[in-house]
């Protein structure tokens, strides 16, 4: 993006008027008999309304008698203002100056300025002064030979003609560089510029009909430039594109369609015209409004805004984030069936780098709620983004920007309070939770205990008898309604072959709100796996636990281990295992609600606390009200006694 300060080095042969140009710019008038070389002159941003103008511009005058000093200044320059005034100084542009710049390895723009234009007359002097077109016979050879020459301009320090314009062109070459946009050799916009403009067209096409109608053009104009487009200019754009349609340059492309609007190719052609005519600041105005940097990538500061997330806190979507995601879903659900099919999903993500890697890793859409055809529903769409935000909020902020979120992306997320800890019997345990709506549950158990079926049932899918062992981690996310119509989101994770390694990793366990310890109640060897895990991993006992006896629709078997499940949970002062079957929907609902309860009240589900010291939720507000009431009554009674006492005497 624009630098705070840019350095403009003015070069050229002796006598071309370098110093006079600087003085004419600063003083607004011609002053004769100047000193040979001026010290650096700093010009602040006080005349430009553009937010992309540099804060300060430093003009460096040069003395040709000290070539080493010139070289030092050139190596620190951001742009070169190269001045000539006659035939001899013009010839030295290509024979000396441009060769010198290249020998120094400079890769900065050069603004070529023909000074002292007041000395040249033609049959029409006014015409000569106003002729600043690039087709000038002196400029074209230079532009063709040296790609580093950004633009050319005629000026006169004596009459102050186009001195300000020359200075602006120096600033513009940095604030609105043409090199990222236009390939002079090919004579066309660069692919990266076409890609950026195509994305902007896509985001601006609100009704997704492939055209920018008048209202959409007006909205784009207001977003980019803060004002409505003039109707005459809009009609001129339409006529220009209509004339170009079927021209030699665009033989088979429709650029503008009467009654519909600009096509994507027409929008790109319009911006090509802007760059060819030296109006590329207009194109940059459009690009900058969509947060593109000079490298034509979206600014990282916009994609990944600084969000302060305290340790043991989590990140969730805010109401603005949810609202935007609902609107996006509705916008691209073109058949209004309440789900996004493959085509609609592909179209939705056209303005992004594609599906997030996290979604691919979690096997989206198998990770969330889909309809009978396997298409993600609105419920599943919101659940997937909820999980994404919880696991890696930076993915969410970046993709919301890609999808067209207009505000600061950090407004789409909110930070929960840090997890609080309390102490009982010398042990720390997690305090109750009041402000979180998203919880993370690790589903643990022996192979073939029914974990995968549990995840499938959580997403509302039909039970399958077929067994397929889980190798890679799996995840499922859905919303859960608890008593009082309160809605929470629950993430269930199954780890497959990585299970033991993850359970031995303190940092991974810290991410877990509840351990769902499952066993197959019809397999006598299943519960012993959990006993062994808890024996070998003491750290697991610091996390809230819910025991679950799966496959409860099958015959219950005595477990071949030291403790039976009910006995073991009694030793931990925990509830007996819930008996759950993937074919019993009521038991599933009971389990998911219990996991949410354990997340909200972790102290009650942490192993090892006897019932008499189980942490309870204290209604502090009631206590405060009660205490205040007692205090008020005491004060009132005391006051009345004091008032009545003299009367009694």
UniProtKB/Swiss-Prot annotation:
Family annotation (PROSITE patterns): EF_HAND_1 (PS00018), EF_HAND_2 (PS50222), MIRO (PS51423)
Subcellular location as annotated: Mitochondrion outer membrane
Domain of life of the organism encoding this protein: Eukaryota
SMART domains, A to Z: EFh, RAB, RAS, RHO
EC class name: hydrolase
GO annotation, biological process: heme transport; mitochondrion inheritance; mitochondrion organization; mitochondrion-endoplasmic reticulum membrane tethering; phospholipid homeostasis; regulation of mitochondrion organization; small GTPase-mediated signal transduction
Transmembrane segments: 624-644
Coiled coil (residue ranges): none
Assigned keywords, A-Z: Calcium, GTP-binding, Hydrolase, Membrane, Metal-binding, Mitochondrion, Mitochondrion outer membrane, Nucleotide-binding, Repeat, Transmembrane, Transmembrane helix
All ranges on the Cytoplasmic side of the membrane: 1-623
Predominant localisation class: mitochondrion
Record-given protein name: Mitochondrial Rho GTPase 1
């Amino acid at each position: 993006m624009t630098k705070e300060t840019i350095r403009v080095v003015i070069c050229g042969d002796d006598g071309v008027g370098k110093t006079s140009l600087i003085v004419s710019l600063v003083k607004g008038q011609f002053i004769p008999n100047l000193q040979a070389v001026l010290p650096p002159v700093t010009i602040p941003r006080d005349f430009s309304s553009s937010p992309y103008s540099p804060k300060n511009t430093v003009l460096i005058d040069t003395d040709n008698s000290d070539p080493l000093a010139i070289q030092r200044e050139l190596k620190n320059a951001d742009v070169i203002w190269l001045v000539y005034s006659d035939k001899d100084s013009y010839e030295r542009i290509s024979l000396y100056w441009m060769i010198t710049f290249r020998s120094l390895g400079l890769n900065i723009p050069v603004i070529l300025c023909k000074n002292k234009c007041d000395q040249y007359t033609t049959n029409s002097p006014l015409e000569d002064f106003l002729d600043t077109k690039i087709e000038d016979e002196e400029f074209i050879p230079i532009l063709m030979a040296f790609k580093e020459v950004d633009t050319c301009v005629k000026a006169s320090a004596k009459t102050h003609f186009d001195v300000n314009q020359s200075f602006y062109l120096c600033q513009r070459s940095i604030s609105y560089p043409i090199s990222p946009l236009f390939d002079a050799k090919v004579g066309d916009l660069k692919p990266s510029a076409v890609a950026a403009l195509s994305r902007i067209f896509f985001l601006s096409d609100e009704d997704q009909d492939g055209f920018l109608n008048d209202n959409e053009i007006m909205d784009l104009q207001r977003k980019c430039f803060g004002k409505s487009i003039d109707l005459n200019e809009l009609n001129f754009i339409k006529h220009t594109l209509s004339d170009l349609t079927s021209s030699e340059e665009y033989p088979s492309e429709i650029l503008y369609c009467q009654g519909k609007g600009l096509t994507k190719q027409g929008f790109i052609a319009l911006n090509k015209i802007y760059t060819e005519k030296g109006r590329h600041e207009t194109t940059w105005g459009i690009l900058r409004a969509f947060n593109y940097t000079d490298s034509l990538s979206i600014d990282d500061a916009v994609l990944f805004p600084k969000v302060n997330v305290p340790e043991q806190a989590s990140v969730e979507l805010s109401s603005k984030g949810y609202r935007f995601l609902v609107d996006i879903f509705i916008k691209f659900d073109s058949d209004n069936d309440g789900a996004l099919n493959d085509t609609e999903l592909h179209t939705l993500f056209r303005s992004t780098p594609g599906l997030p890697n996290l979604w691919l890793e979690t096997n989206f859409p198998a990770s969330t709620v889909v309809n009978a055809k396997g298409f993600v529903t609105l419920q599943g769409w919101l659940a997937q983004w909820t999980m994404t935000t919880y696991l890696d909020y930076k993915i969410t902020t970046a993709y919301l920007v890609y999808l067209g979120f207009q505000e600061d992306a950090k407004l789409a997320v909110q930070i929960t309070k840090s997890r609080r800890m309390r102490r009982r019997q010398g042990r720390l345990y997690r305090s109750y939770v009041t402000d979180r709506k998203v919880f993370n549950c690790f589903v643990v158990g022996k192979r073939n205990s029914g974990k995968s079926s549990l995840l499938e049932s959580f997403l509302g899918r039909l039970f399958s008898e077929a067994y397929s062992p889980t190798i890679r981690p799996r995840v499922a996310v859905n919303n859960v309604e608890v008593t009082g119509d309160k809605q929470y989101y629950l993430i269930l994770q199954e780890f497959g072959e990585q299970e033991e390694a993850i359970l031995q990793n303190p940092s991974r366990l810290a991410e877990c709100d509840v351990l769902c310890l499952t066993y197959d109640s019809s397999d006598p060897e299943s519960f012993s796996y959990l006993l062994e895990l808890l024996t070998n991993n003491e750290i697991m006992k610091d996390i809230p636990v819910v025991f679950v006896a799966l496959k409860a629709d099958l015959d219950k078997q005595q477990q071949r281990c030291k403790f039976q499940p009910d006995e073991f949970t009694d030793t931990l002062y925990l509830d007996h295992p819930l008996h759950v079957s993937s074919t019993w929907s009521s038991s599933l609902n009971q389990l998911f609600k219990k996991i949410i309860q354990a997340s909200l009240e972790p102290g009650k589900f942490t192993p090892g606390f006897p019932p008499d010291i189980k942490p309870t939720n204290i209604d502090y507000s009631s206590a405060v009200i009660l205490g205040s009431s007692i205090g008020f009554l005491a004060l009132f009674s005391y006051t009345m006694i004091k008032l009545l006492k003299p009367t009694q005497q």
